[in-house]
Design a protein with these regions (language model features):
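Class I SAM-dependent methyltransferase SAM/SAH-binding core
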Residues: 12-15, 19-72
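A generic alpha-to-beta junction signature in SAM-dependent methyltransferases
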Residues: 6-7, 31, 109
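C-terminal lobe and adjacent flexible extensions of AdoMet/dcAdoMet transferase-like proteins
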Residues: 168-175
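Conserved alpha-helix/loop element of class I SAM-dependent methyltransferases that forms part
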Residues: 1-10
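A short glycine-rich, Lys/Arg-flanked "PGG" loop and its adjoining helix->strand segment in the class I
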Residues: 96-114
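C-terminal alpha-helical "lid/dimerization" subdomain adjacent to the S-adenosyl-L-methionine
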Residues: 114-168
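A short SAM/SAH-binding and catalytic strip from SAM-dependent methyltransferases
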Residues: 81-96
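A short acidic, Gly/Pro-enriched loop at the edge of an enzyme's catalytic core
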Residues: 68-83
């Protein structure tokens, strides 16, 4: 699905996860000449879902992964070309904390940069697949509200399966 997105400037990449990282090795292979920085926002006192605790036990850690808080990404303003949040942002259960995370993502993103968020949605296909487990996910409306509050616009939504959405986001550059 990454091949179908117009990604200009892929020198400085960030992949942010909740400690369950299935994607950094794949991203580095895809963008071999890039500078990929990987951050893990997992905080056992705030992110208490049992599924993420189990997943962390079996996940490989990408070399150089740094632990961060959702409220502070240790990067300069406007320094990142592409920021990935791949099946991770829904682990931030608090609306306020999720807004802090996306405000930080917006802050570090270059003017023409992209944020790619991959998530299940709280919708009919996911209800049919996960039954009440779909309550772990957020609706498109909830995501859109978070993006709006972080000064990020939804450029495109791509359904790469009936169950998964890719949100292609851009920073709204104030004049």
């Amino acid at each position: 699905w990454v091949d179908n997105i117009n990604l200009k400037g892929n020198n400085n990449l960030v992949n942010i996860n909740a400690g369950f990282d299935e994607t950094s090795f794949i991203l580095k292979n895809k963008f071999q000449s890039s500078n990929l920085q990987v951050f893990d926002f997992y905080d056992q006192t705030r992110h208490t879902e049992q599924a993420i605790k189990r997943a962390r036990k079996v996940s490989r850690v990408y070399p150089g992964t740094k632990s961060i808080s959702t409220g502070k990404i240790p990067l300069k303003d406007s320094s990142i070309d592409i920021l990935f949040l791949l099946s991770a942002a829904h682990e931030v259960r608090s609306n306020e904390e999720r807004e802090l995370l996306f405000n930080e993502c917006s802050r570090v993103l270059k003017k023409q940069g992209k944020i790619l968020v991959v998530e299940h949605l709280r919708d009919l296909p996911n209800f049919l697949a996960f039954s009440v487990g779909f309550m772990h996910f957020f609706s498109k409306k909830t995501w859109k509200s978070v993006f709006d509050k972080a000064n990020i616009k939804l450029e495109e939504e791509i359904k790469f399966t009936p169950f998964m959405s890719v949100f292609v986001l851009e920073k709204i550059n104030k004049k």
